Curated annotation (Swiss-Prot):
Residues 138-452 form the Kinesin motor domain. Residues 18-30, 589-600 have a biased composition (Basic and acidic residues). Expressed in roots, leaves, stems and flowers. Its main location: membrane. One of its GO terms (cellular component) is cytosol. ATP binds at G219, Q220, T221, H222, A223, G224, K225, T226. Residues 1-10 have a biased composition (Polar residues). Homodimer and heterodimer with KCA1. Interacts with CDKA-1. Interacts with At4g14310. Pfam families: Kinesin. The keyword Membrane applies. This is Kinesin-like protein KIN-14B. GO terms for biological process: chloroplast accumulation movement; chloroplast avoidance movement; microtubule-based movement; nuclear migration along microfilament.
Length: 1264
């Protein structure tokens, strides 16, 4: 296998898993280069040193030059193709933009014409509204009385009607102490702000229409002026309500060519001095001039666009005004809303103004005992209010001269008081007896402003009898209304009682039925509830058992670890004892040798020492056997979990033959049957490709999956103390994942993996930097997901991996390796053919036996030269650590683990060890099985080291298995995209013969495009499978420019064919008028002009359909538009006579009034025409039904009303009564709506209705 070098450029080919080929087979096979790199090798012994090096450089330069030339030619051809394609696209876009520009110009012209027609109507509406508002004059006076407080005593005000207020003066000198005043509107204490504003609203409308409007709040202090203008938070006053009404009216009246803008000015008038309340808010506000020429003032104005901004500006002005109540009672507050209307079409600009004035208190007119500055303030207030009254009185009496110059207030508001402006004064009074003088003063002032005279005493009698007559008249009207209302209530109650009885019967039946259904549902619910409870109990017990098993497994693992540690310590102690014994034995041997020189030393003493050393050796062998048994038990428990996961693969895969170390290097090491690939569980006939479900798809959830997902997502390392606790928690979660997959079984293995996939990969990425996870557990989890991907992806199952002997190396072999002289095992790069694999060097040497072992062997009768290798625990740990270092980041080795079952892989490693190290082989004398145990220990150590290494991450990259999973997923996505690309290319090259094939091709291309976009979306969201940097796309998206162009061409072709079909349908008559025939031919010519927007492959179909329609229209006879027989149209001339209908649909029409409802049956014939069946006469329902074909609305386009009546005279009377109107345009509009209603009732004609609506045939409005 070859390992690709890491570069900064993307390579979309998954390298390292191609089949190995012998040198002889590679010579005749053409391979497409996957990158710009080339490998060139020349044998060293074929050329002299200098000449061979020079020749290799020259050949390399020639190859690079040729490669550059080929790339240049290819790039030049691509640039030419791209230029042609861009020119075609630009030309098509230019034509499309031209069409859009023409349509835009037509729409603008239509908008101008519409605005020109509407503008006079709007102006006329404004004029009529202002005339209606000023029928009784431009000045109106309203009177409002506020509610009394508890300490103010009784009220002296009465309200005879809505326009009269009566004051009880309690003057006994008069014959009638009550005085009455008439105003335009009178409001009692019970009237709220909303009712008041409903009468003020016309003035706001007039201001928006272009008139200047002023609204005054007048009255004594504490009479309710400020409340009327400002209101409260719950009941707002005129300020907020007027502006909101202006905004609502402006939004409803604004168009694309006209708009309104609003600005606000707030100032107060104190002692004839103006104070701008907005000048302190912002320094750069625009200015506006107000008042007459002699008294012009400059004020700040702020633009407002909504009610909230208006209230913000108003509150800011109130804050600048201050809270001095003594000053506010003698100050006039003016809020001016400036309205600007502009129309870009008529170039009309209208500016108007709405002034809301909160006047000072009117009690200043009667105060006489004040002195000092306050008297001056009161005099100014008296002067301004009196001048305002004079101006209003002059306006209502229509005098020639209006005294605006008498007060600064009237001079400022002069443009809002005279001329065409409107003025409203709201008089606020307090109905308490203690305020009688102020009440009379306010009412007299208001009456003088309105130019009315209060009632006198000598007219009291007349007024009294007039009131009596009015009361009597009102009472009679009320009695009549009450009588009529009671009659209507009786009739309604009778009808309601009848309907209620019917409803009671129906409800009783429904209740009975509901009771039966409810009883059935309750019984079913109880049974289902019992089943759910039982199921919950069973699941709870299973969950509890599973937790107990996991706890037991964890406890057993801890105990096994403790036992292993104890065994290691025991072994170390025994080894130290062995060394002591060896030293003692050497001393004893030396002493024996010295004593053997002495002939008097007896021989049994030496035999006794030999027996003692043999006993010690036996004891040591027993301890070693116990340790081997314990290690074997731990190994079995460790492999038990992984063997269950790979049981399915082992059962279905073919046994791989053990590799021979003597095999020829040119022989293929693995074929399809012996590559260790997983069996495919998907159907390969259609080449379908599926990945593990992405997070965007709906994944089936299980209780175990939900528990594991929550546990993995909620795991927080910060909550643990120390790395040991974090590692213990993380490893327990990984073991739970493996246990959940085992419990799910082979049938639900993929579902549980897909359910917890995102959580598992997120957990692994989160814990990788901490380096606390057991990498063997990580490897097992990774292998589960890669094998799940292999089982669902056919194109991955043909991947071949190198045999295990390619990854193993004996020390001091003839293979090419690095120049390191270290004798310890490590990474040594070994090149096999065209691949680069690092071989793991297993450094094992036969050890020399000690004298003690030799003595024991001689005593037992064994040959001294047939000793066996003893592998210690330290040596096994050393091999395992070196194997782990070798496997870190080794993707070829990770592929070997994925594609080869664990048991088979360990067997191959054991076979290689037995063949490579003869001193570990089993001989006839080795009957104890120690050698077999040593091979098992060595193979297990290598397997464990490799398994731990391929699961270890090397920051900033993930582990080797994670990188392999990413490469496999990229290969699957690449295959999917290429498959869809091939399908789309095939469809794009097909030629459509008719409209049906066009629709099928368009639907197929749209379906392929939808699938491609779905795969792209899945790629972007599949973050768990890809470990890419900087968020770049993992798979190159093939260009779909040709397919997109064909799809756009098919869409245009489909639209052209639909229009041709509509023209053919309109031409399905016996005779056509000249104008109609000319219009149809022009439409066909326009379709011919749209042909360049299609691709060449679609031209024949479109041209054929257009030519057929053109010939059909040409063959139809034509007649003059103004022939005499055209004035008498008939049903036969405008529609076919086929009246055969397979199914009738019934509609009932009720025209109201005294006429009975009538029924019309509608259907469709074979020509897709609307056919109706109804009574010939409405008044004769039993006179017999007639069947007629209903003409389309386009037939009535050029007919007069009389001609339409003649057409409807041949149809049932019900149709003519529903369609005929007073005018021809109205009849066409009503008939269009009726035709749509009837046709939509027939399912086969609904598509026809849609086409007619798009073509503009069905119109609800009057046709021009």
């Amino acid at each position: 296998m070859a390992e690709q070098k890491s570069t900064n450029m993307w390579n979309w080919e998954v390298t390292g898993f191609e089949s190995k080929k012998s040198p002889s087979s590679e010579e005749g096979v053409h391979r497409t280069p996957s990158s710009m790199l080339r490998r060139y090798s020349i044998p060293k012994n074929s050329l002299p040193p200098h000449s061979s090096e020079l020749a290799s450089k020259v050949q390399s330069l020639k190859d690079k030059v040729q490669l550059a030339k080929d790339d240049y030619v290819g790039l030049r051809q691509e640039a030419t193709d791209l230029q042609e394609y861009s020119n075609a696209k630009l030309e098509r876009v230019t034509r499309y933009l031209g069409v859009l520009a023409d349509k835009s110009r037509k729409l603008d012209q239509y908008a101008l014409e519409t605005e020109a027609r509407i503008s006079p109507l709007i102006n006329e509406k404004k004029r009529l509204f202002n005339d209606l508002l000023t029928t009784k004059g431009n000045v109106k006076v309203f009177c409002r009385a506020r509610p009394l407080f508890e300490d103010e005593g009784p009220s002296i005000i009465e309200f005879p009607d809505n326009c009269t207020i009566r004051v009880n003066t309690s003057d006994d000198t008069l014959s009638n102490p009550k005085k009455e005043f008439e105003f335009d509107r009178v409001y009692g204490p019970q009237v709220g702000q909303a009712s008041l504003f409903s009468d003020v609203q016309p003035f706001v409308q007039s201001a928006l229409d272009g008139s200047n409007v002023s609204i005054f709040a007048y009255g004594q202090t504490h009479a309710g002026k400020t409340y009327t203008m400002e209101g409260s938070n719950q009941d707002r006053g005129l300020y907020a309500r007027c502006f909101e009404e202006l905004m609502d009216l402006a939004n409803s009246d604004s168009t694309s060519a006209s708009q309104f803008s609003f600005s606000v000015s707030v100032f107060e008038l104190y002692n004839e001095q103006v104070r701008d309340l907005l000048s302190g808010c912002q320094s750069n506000l625009p200015k506006i001039n107000m008042g007459l020429r002699e008294s012009v003032i400059e004020l700040s104005q702020e633009k407002v666009d909504n009610p909230s901004e208006f209230m913000r500006v108003l509150n800011s002005a109130f804050q600048n005004r201050g809270n001095d109540k003594s000053k506010s009672t003698v100050t006039h507050l003016i809020v001016s809303i400036h309205i600007c209307y502009s129309n870009t079409i008529t170039r009309e600009n209208v500016i108007s103004k709405l002034s809301l004035v909160d006047l000072a208190g009117s009690e200043g007119l009667t105060v006489e005992d004040d002195n000092g500055d306050h008297v001056t303030d009161l005099l100014h207030v008296t002067n301004s209010i009196s001048a305002l009254g004079d101006v209003l009185s002059s306006l209502t009496s229509k005098r020639d001269t209006i005294p605006y110059e008498n007060s600064f207030l009237t001079r400022i508001l002069a443009d809002s008081l005279g001329g065409s402006s409107k003025t409203l004064m709201i008089v606020n009074i307090c109905p308490s007896a203690r305020n009688l003088s102020e009440i009379m003063s306010c009412l007299n002032y208001a009456a003088r402003a309105r130019n009315t005279v209060p009632s006198l005493g000598n007219r009291d009698t007349i007024k009294k009898w007039r009131d009596v007559a009015n009361d009597a008249r009102k009472e009679v009207l009320e009695k009549e209304r009450e009588n009529q209302r009671l009659k209507q209530e009786v009739t309604g109650l009778k009808q309601a009682l009848k309907e209620a009885n019917d409803q009671c019967v129906l409800l009783y039946n429904e209740v009975q039925r509901a009771w039966r259904v409810s009883f059935t549902l309750q019984s079913d619910l109880k049974s289902e509830n019992a089943m759910v409870v039982d199921k919950h109990k069973i699941e709870k017990e299973q969950n509890f058992q599973l937790r107990n098993q996991i706890a037991q497994l964890l406890q057993l693992e801890q105990e096994q670890k403790l036992q292993a540690q104890q065994q290691d310590s025991t072994i170390q102690n025994l080894q130290s004892k062995v060394k002591d014994l060896e030293s003692q034995l050497s001393k004893a041997l030396k002493s024996d040798m010295t004593r053997s020189r002495d002939p008097l030393e007896p021989q049994p003493r030496a035999a006794e020492n030999t027996l003692d050393s043999s006993a010690v050796t036996k004891k040591l062998e027993e301890e070693l056997k116990k340790r081997d048994a314990l290690i074997e038990r731990l190994h079995e428990e460790n492999e038990k979990l992984f063997d269950r996961l790979t049981e399915k693969s082992v059962a279905s895969s073919t046994q791989v033959s053990s590799p021979s170390s003597k095999a020829s290097p040119t022989v293929q090491p693995a074929d399809v049957d012996s590559a260790g690939t997983l069996p495919s569980s998907v159907d390969k006939n259609e080449g379908t490709i599926t990945l593990v479900k992405s997070s965007s798809e709906l994944v089936k959830t299980t209780p175990a999956g939900e528990y594991l997902t929550a546990a993995l997502n909620d795991f927080d390392p910060e909550q643990y103390e120390g790395l040991a606790a974090i590692a213990d928690g993380a490893n327990k979660l990984l073991m739970l994942v493996l246990a959940a997959v085992i419990k799910a079984g082979a049938s639900r293995e993929h579902e549980i993996l897909a359910e917890i996939r995102d959580s598992v990969f997120s957990f692994i990425r989160k814990m990788e930097p901490r380096r606390v996870m057991d990498t063997m557990l990580v490897s097992r989890v990774r292998i589960l997901y890669i094998r799940s991907l292999l089982a669902r992806s056919p194109e991955l199952q043909s991947i071949k991996v190198s045999p295990v002997e390619r990854f193993l190396e004996k020390p001091y072999t003839g293979r090419t390796r690095s120049s390191s002289g270290s004798s310890s095992p490590g990474r040594s790069p070994v090149r096999y053919y065209d691949e680069q694999i690092y071989g793991f060097k297993v450094n094992l040497k036969p050890e020399k036996k000690s004298k003690l072992v030799s003595v024991v062997s001689r005593i037992r009768g064994h040959d001294q030269d047939t000793g066996r290798q003893q592998v210690t625990g330290g040596k096994l740990r050393e091999i395992q650590d070196e194997a782990k270092s070798f496997a870190i980041g080794n993707k070829p080795l990770a592929a070997l683990f994925v594609h080869t079952p664990a048991g088979e892989l360990q067997r191959q490693i054991r076979s290689w060890l037995a063949e490579s190290f003869e001193f570990l082989s089993v001989t006839a004398d080795d009957v104890s099985g120690v050698t077999t145990g040593q091979l098992e220990l060595l193979s297990t150590a290598i397997m464990d080291g490799w398994m731990a290494g391929v699961g270890a991450a090397v920051p900033p990259h993930t582990d080797a298995l994670g990188q392999l999973l990413s490469e496999y997923a990229k290969r699957v996505y690449t295959s999917q995209m290429q498959h869809l690309k091939d399908i789309a290319g095939t469809l794009a090259s097909e030629e459509a013969e008719d409209a049906g094939q066009v629709a099928k091709l368009r639907s197929a291309l749209e379906s392929v495009d939808h699938k491609r976009r779905k795969i792209l979306q899945q790629m972007r969201s599949d973050a768990a499978l890809f470990t890419l940097e900087e968020g770049s796309s993992p798979v190159q998206n093939p260009s779909t420019a040709a397919e997109d162009s064909r799809l756009a061409s098919l869409i245009s072709l489909d639209a052209i064919l639909k229009q041709v079909k509509e023209i053919t349908r309109q031409a399905s008559v016996h005779v056509l008028s000249k104008s109609k025939k000319k219009a149809l031919l022009e439409s066909l010519d326009e379709l011919n002009e749209r042909m360049p927007s299609l691709l060449d492959v679609d031209h024949p179909c479109a041209q054929r359909e257009i030519d057929t329609a053109h010939q059909l229209v040409e063959t139809i006879p034509e007649q003059e538009d103004n022939l005499q027989d055209e004035k008498r149209p008939s049903i036969d001339s405008i529609s076919s006579t086929e009246t055969d209908v397979s199914q009738w649909n019934v509609l009932q029409f009720n025209t109201g009034g005294s006429s009975a409802p009538f029924i019309i049956k509608c259907g469709a014939n074979s020509n897709s025409e609307l056919v109706i069946k109804a009574d010939a006469r409405i008044q004769e329902p039993k006179g017999g039904e007639i069947v007629r074909v209903v003409p389309r609305p386009s037939v009535l386009e050029n007919m007069s009303l009389e001609e339409m009546k003649q057409v409807f005279g041949q149809l049932p009377e019900a149709l003519s009564s529903l369609a005929l109107a007073r005018t021809a345009d109205g009849t066409r509009a009503r008939y269009s709506r009726l035709y749509r209603t009837l046709a939509m009732k027939v399912p086969s004609l609904r598509d026809l209705v849609g086409e007619l609506e798009k073509g503009g045939v069905l119109k609800d409005t009057k046709s021009t």
